[in-house]
Amino acid sequence: MKTIEVDDELYHYIASRTQAIGESASDILRRLLRLPASPQPFVLVQENMINELKDLAKLPKQKKQLHQQDKVIKQVEFVLASSLFNNETKGVNRFLYLLSALYKADPESFSHATENVQGSERIYFARDEQTILATGSSVKAKQIPESPFWVITNNNTERKGIILCALMNAMELPEELVARIKAQFN
């Protein structure tokens, strides 16, 4: 029996394929690689099997990303269809409703996206009001509902749309959804 090191993601993938209590990692890998159940003195693994195993290791992460993206899309669709959003006359409130929905649906992706979305001279997102206010004398900020984030709010409607679209693109949301949001802020 030999010992090998595998990264956490691969370890969790192999462990998730356990079919019986006490099944060893060797048994699981033999099943996944379609090798005989009894150990052989030497087994030649073909290149295509190695590539197939690499592809299998990527599947859980891709499925998680797709599931998370679906959750975000549904949350945004819900806001767009809500009477609260459609009856709201103030652009800043519509802006905050959508930002809140994006955060609630995928806080991790939202957080990463805010790090990449900023103006040439202003910070658009921060975890405290003072960080945003420090970027200019006439800057106003509001807290995004149900999130730890603050956002700059004294932009015109079109700029709010640009900020939202940039954030959604950074979150890797579908272009057609981004285009629908952009149309709301023209």
Swiss-Prot record:
<dbReference type="Pfam" id="PF17206">
    <property type="entry name" value="SeqA_N"/>
</dbReference>
<dbReference type="InterPro" id="IPR026577">
    <property type="entry name" value="SeqA_DNA-bd_C"/>
</dbReference>
<keyword id="KW-0236">DNA replication inhibitor</keyword>
<dbReference type="InterPro" id="IPR005621">
    <property type="entry name" value="SeqA"/>
</dbReference>
<comment type="subunit">
    <text>Homodimer. Polymerizes to form helical filaments.</text>
</comment>
<comment type="similarity">
    <text>Belongs to the SeqA family.</text>
</comment>
<protein>
    <recommendedName>
        <fullName>Negative modulator of initiation of replication</fullName>
    </recommendedName>
</protein>
<keyword id="KW-0963">Cytoplasm</keyword>
<dbReference type="InterPro" id="IPR010985">
    <property type="entry name" value="Ribbon_hlx_hlx"/>
</dbReference>
<dbReference type="GO" id="GO:0006355">
    <property type="term" value="P:regulation of DNA-templated transcription"/>
</dbReference>
<keyword id="KW-0238">DNA-binding</keyword>
<dbReference type="InterPro" id="IPR036835">
    <property type="entry name" value="SeqA_DNA-bd_C_sf"/>
</dbReference>
<dbReference type="InterPro" id="IPR033761">
    <property type="entry name" value="SeqA_N"/>
</dbReference>
<dbReference type="GO" id="GO:0032297">
    <property type="term" value="P:negative regulation of DNA-templated DNA replication initiation"/>
</dbReference>
<dbReference type="GO" id="GO:0003677">
    <property type="term" value="F:DNA binding"/>
</dbReference>
<dbReference type="InterPro" id="IPR013321">
    <property type="entry name" value="Arc_rbn_hlx_hlx"/>
</dbReference>
<dbReference type="Pfam" id="PF03925">
    <property type="entry name" value="SeqA"/>
</dbReference>
<dbReference type="GO" id="GO:0005737">
    <property type="term" value="C:cytoplasm"/>
</dbReference>
<comment type="function">
    <text>Negative regulator of replication initiation, which contributes to regulation of DNA replication and ensures that replication initiation occurs exactly once per chromosome per cell cycle. Binds to pairs of hemimethylated GATC sequences in the oriC region, thus preventing assembly of replication proteins and re-initiation at newly replicated origins. Repression is relieved when the region becomes fully methylated.</text>
</comment>
